[in-house]
Amino acid sequence: MLEPVGERPQLWRAELIVKHIPRKRFGQHFLTDQGIIEGIVQAIAPRAGQAVVEIGPGLAALTQPLVERLGHLTVIELDRDLAQQLRAHPQLTVVESDVLKVDFRQLAERLQHGPVRSAGLPQAETAPKGLEPAGSSSQQGPRDWLRQTAGAAAPSRGSAVHEVTSVGAHKLRVVGNLPYNISTPILFHLLDAVDVIEDQHFMLQKEVIDRMVAAPSTSDYGRLSVMLQWRYAMENVLFVPPQSFDPPPRVDSAVVRMVPHAHPAALDVKLLSQLVQVAFSQRRKLLRHTLGQWLTARGFPGAFDVQRRAEEVPVAEYVALAQQVAAMAV
């Protein structure tokens, strides 16, 4: 076990790096480029007292500069050896768990009362104990970008809009270098808890981010684009080349900013997911061969242009169609 950090964070990180060998089964590629690290921290713009959760802290390349600005940080780490070493840091709460099993709503509720000093697993069946009061902060949200634009098209308008989000102090800011092999499941897991999240900043495979932020009528636009853009404003904020990691991955990476829309359309998310999956099941064919038949089978009486391909339909139209189909059952 490492000695407590105290006033020697650089030595603590050096010992952590020496003691750990990357594991392929966890998809571990550790960020080492200091310029990229500084760029990510600048994009996140953490403020003291904010409830920030880092997924996959690894060798603490991003963790240490974050905690220096925050005062306290909660991290989620699956690797048992890394979790053990990270616990040596007095300003970290370590949740040793698969992130897909973490209950983010419960975690947000508990962090509202201050840093969770226990490393208990915040799941529905097992809650962390030993909560302590947190220091308060009067600082406002730091993201000028959020105040200027909501980025990706909001479902209700179909084009870029100006939007300001009213954020409760208890909401989470979630960051991390996500394992590329399970990045999409993690994104959808967080979508289930989006109402308790202020924003998200993730390192991902660049081609995944290209799909996330893609506009209609482009080759990258697909199911992932629709399912995330209806709920988030998103922006690709930083390109990250393979040589920024150890070991270097075989793909380019990037950092995406995801800010939940302040006033999302009310809809049945499962129905939207099913509808979009049918639409993109044969993306090169006209929708009359896929979604059109799906709508006919449900006796849909409304008007929807199926003489298009799935990639030509804006997010707003998919959302409106899901609402109309749901209304039929009322």
UniProtKB/Swiss-Prot annotation:
Broad EC category: transferase
Binding site residues for S-adenosyl-L-methionine: H29, L31, G56, E77, D98, N177
InterPro entries xrefs: KsgA/Erm (IPR001737), rRNA_Ade_diMease-like_C (IPR023165), rRNA_Ade_Mease_Trfase_CS (IPR020596), rRNA_Ade_methylase_Trfase_N (IPR020598), rRNA_adenine_dimethylase (IPR011530), SAM-dependent_MTases_sf (IPR029063)
Region described as Disordered: 115-158
Family as reported in the entry's similarity comment: Belongs to the class I-like SAM-binding methyltransferase superfamily. rRNA adenine N(6)-methyltransferase family. RsmA subfamily.
Role of this protein: Specifically dimethylates two adjacent adenosines (A1518 and A1519) in the loop of a conserved hairpin near the 3'-end of 16S rRNA in the 30S particle. May play a critical role in biogenesis of 30S subunits.
Protein's UniProt name: Ribosomal RNA small subunit methyltransferase A
Lineage: Bacteria, Pseudomonadati, Pseudomonadota, Betaproteobacteria, Burkholderiales
